[in-house]
Amino acid sequence: MAKTSMIIKAQRGSKFKVREYNRCPLCGRPRAYYRKFDMCRICLRKLASSGQIPGVIKSSW
């Protein structure tokens, strides 16, 4: 889990637009963020495998 202070700091707007970065709203992770789903890869995988994200299925070939 990310530190609470870092999550709060990221939510506030920064002085410069370039310094802003995306964080997962569920766990606060700053890396491996998917804009389309607004969450990190770990939370995306967890929710997709449990069937909570509509239209996302596990691929098999």
From Swiss-Prot:
Which residues are listed as membrane-spanning? Answer: none
The entry's cellular-component GO terms read: cytoplasm; small ribosomal subunit
Annotated GO molecular function terms are: rRNA binding; structural constituent of ribosome; zinc ion binding
Family as reported in the entry's similarity comment? Belongs to the universal ribosomal protein uS14 family. Zinc-binding uS14 subfamily.
What the record notes about the co-factor is: Binds 1 zinc ion per subunit.
| Pfam families reported in the protein's UniProt record | Ribosomal_S14 (PF00253)
Q: Keyword Ribonucleoprotein, does the record have it?
A: yes
GO BP annotation list = translation
Q: Which InterPro entries match?
A: Ribosomal_uS14 (IPR001209), Ribosomal_uS14_bact (IPR023053), Ribosomal_uS14_CS (IPR018271), Ribosomal_uS14_sf (IPR043140)
Protein's UniProt keywords contain Phosphoprotein: no
Instruction: Cite the entry's keywords alphabetically.
Output: Metal-binding, Ribonucleoprotein, Ribosomal protein, RNA-binding, rRNA-binding, Zinc
The source's superkingdom equals Bacteria
Positions with a binding annotation for Zn(2+) = 24, 27, 40, 43
Its cofactor is: Zn(2+)
What NCBIfam families does the record tag this protein with?
PRK08061.1
Protein name per the record? Small ribosomal subunit protein uS14
Q: Where is the signal peptide, in residue numbers?
A: none
